[in-house]
From Swiss-Prot:
Binding site for Fe cation: H215, H269
Chain residues that bind a plastoquinone: H215, F262
Domain of life of the organism encoding this protein: Eukaryota
Membrane topology type: Multi-pass membrane protein
Catalytically driven reaction(s): 2 a plastoquinone + 4 hnu + 2 H2O = 2 a plastoquinol + O2
UniProt remark on cofactor binding: The D1/D2 heterodimer binds P680, chlorophylls that are the primary electron donor of PSII, and subsequent electron acceptors. It shares a non-heme iron and each subunit binds pheophytin, quinone, additional chlorophylls, carotenoids and lipids. There is also a Cl(-1) ion associated with D1 and D2, which is required for oxygen evolution. The PSII complex binds additional chlorophylls, carotenoids and specific lipids.
The gene coding this protein: psbD
Presence of the UniProt keyword Translocase in the record: no
Protein known as: Photosystem II D2 protein
Localization annotation: Plastid, Chloroplast thylakoid membrane
Length: 353
């Protein structure tokens, strides 16, 4: 038997080591250093949104009812943006606008700024959480990299776009119908659907949905052998003890369908990662361009010919007229403080009139 004589080699832990040990301890819900950012920000963002949609009116900022208390439902309630006159103020509760008055702060739109900033940092915290856990268990950080796509879209739409405009007023309010209205605004004032970055974003998101459906169906088709049971859903009730997934079989199937197929699993799954993330990033870049009022495609020759020839019209010229109508109606409706009055002769009409 060996007896060790002397002092223990274990050194007392410092504050940082103690915190690191507690934060990264194996537990049912991992906390981690990223949790110090994620959990408070997510809690405040969600709590602010629930508070705003339940109790807070948009009468003082938009002239609208926007809460359950006023009769809205889940689709029409929203936490609306601050008034246009407040420009890019951070709208701190203790700031010069609200001066510590919580009711006034809510009336001015302070909850929108509260939810937007805490939401942005909450998303960043969630990305860091994926990175931290991946590092702990020895995975590559591709999940965290993929999540930069949603973060880029959120930050560009809710923060960068209004920063390029005259104020937070022009950001989307946090609500379903409010987001739909913002999309109509984007189309009318920026011709967003004809923007090449929007086109790349649509291709990325819908392409990713197609890839996901194809991949799921292919794996489901090849993961188990068919049995003899007359059950339509026998694939979900396998009698095998082990999976029989075959990349070779899947490759042969798609080679016959398209003439080409992915050669290996790594390239296949990288492509499924690349398509949606690139689409989201392209959309985010496009929104940053809109913040600077960069224009989409303009087919001026068609517009000139349509103006000269009442019988000439294309889908493009019809959409341009539609955009003019959206602008003429939404500008006066959404910005009553501007007292916009358009004479009838400038309102859009069809080319044949």
């Amino acid at each position: 038997m060996t007896i060790a004589i002397g002092k223990s080699s274990k050194q007392p832990q410092g504050l940082f080591d103690s915190m690191d040990d507690w934060l990264r301890r194996d537990r049912f819900v991992f906390v981690g250093w990223s949790g110090l950012l994620l959990f408070p920000c997510a809690y405040f963002a969600l709590g602010g949104w629930l508070t705003g949609t339940t109790f807070v009116t948009s009468w003082y900022t938009h002239g609208l009812a926007s809460s359950y208390l006023e009769g809205c439902n889940f689709l029409t309630a929203a936490v609306s943006t601050p008034a246009n006159s407040l420009a890019h103020s951070l709208l701190l509760l203790w700031g010069p606008e609200a001066q510590g008055d919580f009711t006034r702060w809510c009336q001015l739109g302070g909850l929108w700024a509260f939810v937007a900033f805490h939401g942005a940092f909450g998303l960043i915290g969630f990305m860091l959480r994926q990175f931290e856990i991946a590092r702990s268990v020895g995975l590559r950080p591709y999940n965290a990299i993929a999540f930069t796509g949603p973060i880029a879209v959120f930050v560009s739409v809710f923060l960068i776009y209004p920063l390029g405009q005259s104020g937070w007023f022009f950001a989307p309010s946090f609500g379903v119908a409010a987001i739909f209205r913002f999309i109509l605004f984007f189309q009318g004032f920026h011709n967003w659907t004809l923007n090449p970055f929007h086109m790349m974003g649509v291709a990325g998101v819908l392409g990713a949905a197609l890839l996901c459906a194809i991949h799921g169906a292919t794996v489901e088709n090849t993961i188990f052998e068919d049995g003899d049971g007359a059950n339509t859903f026998r694939a979900f009730n396998p009698t095998q003890s082990e999976e029989t997934y075959s990349m070779v079989t899947a490759n042969r199937f798609w080679s016959q369908i398209f003439g080409v197929a992915f050669a290996n699993k790594r390239w296949l799954h990288f492509f499924m990662l690349f398509v949606p993330v690139t689409g989201l990033w392209m959309s985010a870049i496009g929104v940053v361009g809109l913040a600077l009022n960069l224009r989409a495609y303009d087919f001026v020759s068609q517009e000139i010919r349509a103006a000269e020839d009442p019988e000439f019209e294309t889908f493009y010229t019809k959409n341009i007229l539609l955009n003019e109508g959206i602008r003429a109606w939404m500008a006066a409706q959404d910005q009553p403080h501007e007292n916009l009055v358009f004479p009838e002769e400038v309102l859009p009409r069809g080319n044949a009139l």
